[in-house]
């Protein structure tokens, strides 16, 4: 059996902390306003794999009302979500992530993001694609108020 899931996440800029995207610290003058580390790419991916396995979403598994997830490392959240997906008998077919940001530029960091994601979801780096786009200065991402991300995940029954 093959299953597909879609995830989406958005975070606004505004906190004095590192900007983490795809598990990688991206140099920038501000970080995200978020309960966890705010990693939009890993949050979207976590939702995609949970959705594909019919396990709900990141908010169900790791509610932002629970202080144990305050400033949580999103790589740990992704690994736990994937562990639950594996328990249902699935492995990754492939994942595809689109980061939507006017700034900062993602290209220099994409290979590192792919490597960390592949490590976390126990697959080959060739099964992980990360790309970035802008909104041509339109909307909140175009005004550099934050970043959005979409992800899809294909799961295969083991």
Curated annotation (Swiss-Prot):
Pathway: Isoprenoid biosynthesis; isopentenyl diphosphate biosynthesis via DXP pathway; isopentenyl diphosphate from 1-deoxy-D-xylulose 5-phosphate: step 4/6. Binds 1 divalent metal cation per subunit. Disulfide bonds: none annotated. Pfam families: YgbB. A divalent metal cation binds at residues 9, 11, 43. Keywords: Isoprene biosynthesis, Lyase, Metal-binding. Coiled coil: none annotated. The record marks 35, 134 as: Transition state stabilizer. The keyword Lipid biosynthesis does not apply. One of its GO terms (biological process) is terpenoid biosynthetic process. InterPro entries: MECDP_synthase (IPR003526), MECDP_synthase_CS (IPR020555), MECDP_synthase_sf (IPR036571). GO terms for molecular function: 2-C-methyl-D-erythritol 2,4-cyclodiphosphate synthase activity; metal ion binding. Homotrimer. This is 2-C-methyl-D-erythritol 2,4-cyclodiphosphate synthase. It comes from Haemophilus influenzae (strain 86-028NP). The gene is ispF.
């Amino acid at each position: 059996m093959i299953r597909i899931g879609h995830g989406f996440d958005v975070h606004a800029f505004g906190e004095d902390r590192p900007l983490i995207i795809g598990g990688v610290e991206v140099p920038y003058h501000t970080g995200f306003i978020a309960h966890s580390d705010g990693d939009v790419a890993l949050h979207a991916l976590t939702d995609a794999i949970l959705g594909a396995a019919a396990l709900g979403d990141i908010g169900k598994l790791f509610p932002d009302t629970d202080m144990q997830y305050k400033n949580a490392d999103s790589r740990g959240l992704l690994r736990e979500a994937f562990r639950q997906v594996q328990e249902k008998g699935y492995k990754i077919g492939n994942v595809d992530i689109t980061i939507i940001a006017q700034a900062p530029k993602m290209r220099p960091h994409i290979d590192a993001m792919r490597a960390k994601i592949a490590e976390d979801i126990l697959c080959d780096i060739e099964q992980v694609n990360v790309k970035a786009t802008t909104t041509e200065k339109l909307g909140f991402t175009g005004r550099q108020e934050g970043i959005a991300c979409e992800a899809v995940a294909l799961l295969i029954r083991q």
